[in-house]
Amino acid sequence: MLSQSTLFLLLLMAIALIAKNQSLIIAISVLLLIKWTGLGDKVFPLMQAKGINLGVTIITIAVLVPIATGDIGFKQLGEATKSLYAWVALGSGIAVALVAASGIDLLKNDPHITAALVLGTIVAVSFLNGVAVGPLIGAGIAYLTMRAIQYIAQLWG
């Protein structure tokens, strides 16, 4: 008999296949392979503990490749400071990093919020051509929203 977690992953795989989402297909395939080979008890806790940080590191490496290849250098950095859009991008980068930082603890400490965020990410990735960095940013936005609600509730309560 298939476990609930396996059935859930297979359902997500069906959604990923229908949506033709390669990232989700690969992610689910890796998880099922680990689960079916019996390595889950050892590998899943490590992935859960370190996965977000590893993913952020991989994304950071990808973003820094143009610097490593020389496609972006000090000249381009200097030119960017003359552009309003570059300043908007700089501010956006700072804001997103701060929002995401708030989300990391929320993802680690609040399982029911994590489930909702993961579901939202799966929907966005599968059907709206979203990218799976959503849980981290989503958690940060959720954290800020929850803090705002708490603040407003204190003012009125």
Curated annotation (Swiss-Prot):
Keywords: Cell membrane, Membrane, Transmembrane, Transmembrane helix. It holds the Pfam family DUF441. The keyword Oxidoreductase does not apply. Belongs to the UPF0756 family. One of its GO terms (cellular component) is plasma membrane. It is a multi-pass membrane protein. The keyword Transmembrane helix applies. The chain crosses the membrane at residues 8-28, 54-74, 84-104, 117-137. It is found in: Cell membrane. This is UPF0756 membrane protein ABC2716. Its main location: membrane. It comes from Shouchella clausii (strain KSM-K16). InterPro entries: UPF0756_TM.
